[in-house]
Amino acid sequence: MRSIGLISASIVLFLFSFSLLSSAADVPVGCSVLTQPQIAAATGVTVSPGAPISAPTSCQWSGSGKIVTLTIRQPLAGKSPVDQFNDAKKKTLPGITTEPASGVGDDAFYIFYAGQNRAGCGLVVKKGTSVFEVRVYGFDLAQAKTVSKTLAKEAAAKF
């Protein structure tokens, strides 16, 4: 009887592990979402190959004072990426501006610090159950919005 319980528990654990792996495999690796030529075309500069920032679901490219980051949102603190998106879209913080963005994904918004571009300009995109952010640095705000939107449209095609 004890061995049947151990076998059953092992099977359940195996199936649970497999489901975690398959759902993790559904999330693109950050550096595979955008290519060096796509980044270079959008920014107008030659950029380094993409490198993960802190996790495989993030990536950064840079060159000539321009930086592009891509971050694919993951579940966090019991909230799905879509829940995080909806919360961030509604949240107001002093000095931080969010603006709706159209024409990319199912829903999107820009996020930036008012009156400066030191912290870059992000475009947070929801497509289906996926959420990602393209953030650009080294551009004035109008340029940053154009560059981030160009790259976000290309990234959205991978989700």
Report each predicted region and the residues it spans.
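Bacterial N-terminal signal peptides
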Residues: 8-19
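Positively charged n-region of N-terminal signal peptides that target proteins for export
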Residues: 1-8
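Sec/Tat-exported extracytoplasmic proteins
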Residues: 35, 43-47, 63, 155-159
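Functionally engaged cysteine thiol sites
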Residues: 31, 36, 57-59, 121
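Short N-terminal segments immediately surrounding and downstream of signal-peptide cleavage
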Residues: 25-43
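A short, solvent-exposed beta-edge/loop patch
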Residues: 25-26, 32, 95-159
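Short, solvent-exposed recognition patches
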Residues: 45-118
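Signal peptide processing junction and immediate N-terminal pro/mature segment
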Residues: 21-23
